[in-house]
């Protein structure tokens, strides 16, 4: 498992030229920290939606991604940057796009396929924030 260190992450993020967006939507939990960094860079509002597909050991937990908070998304007709840390199967991003329909959506992932992405490799990456130990 490779490690993505903070300095490298910040460097890669600073090199991306994002188009204009109205909102950032982070997929919780994995997309929250990357989205917070992007929000700082773009200075636009951020929302969080909870979608889950995998367990903490990254094994599929459900047959399909599951929206954990069922409610109407109040934003329509906007340009949204949808952020997750990893996209392997695309199921989580697909579920989020269905939930956010009525908006123009681009995706960002640290690892995996996205409109914006640092890496697209099969091997799991250890994100800097995952090194924080639990008490």
Predicted regions and their residues:
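Short, highly selective alpha-helical patches that border small-molecule cofactor pockets
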Residues: 31-35, 39, 93
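Alpha-helix capping/helix-boundary segments
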Residues: 30-31, 88
């Amino acid at each position: 498992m490779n490690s993505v260190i903070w300095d490298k992450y910040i460097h890669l993020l600073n090199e991306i030229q994002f188009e204009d967006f109205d909102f950032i939507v982070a997929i919780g939990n994995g997309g929250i920290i990357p989205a917070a960094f992007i929000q700082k860079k773009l200075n636009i509002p951020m929302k969080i939606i909870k979608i889950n597909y995998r367990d903490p050991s990254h094994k599929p937990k459900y047959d399909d991604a599951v929206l954990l908070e069922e409610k109407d998304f109040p934003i329509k007709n906007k340009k949204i940057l949808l952020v997750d840390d990893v996209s392997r199967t695309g199921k989580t991003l697909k579920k989020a796009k269905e939930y956010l329909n009525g908006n123009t959506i681009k995706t960002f992932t640290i690892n995996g396929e996205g409109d914006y992405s640092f890496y697209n490799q099969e091997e799991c990456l250890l994100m800097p924030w995952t090194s924080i130990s639990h008490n």
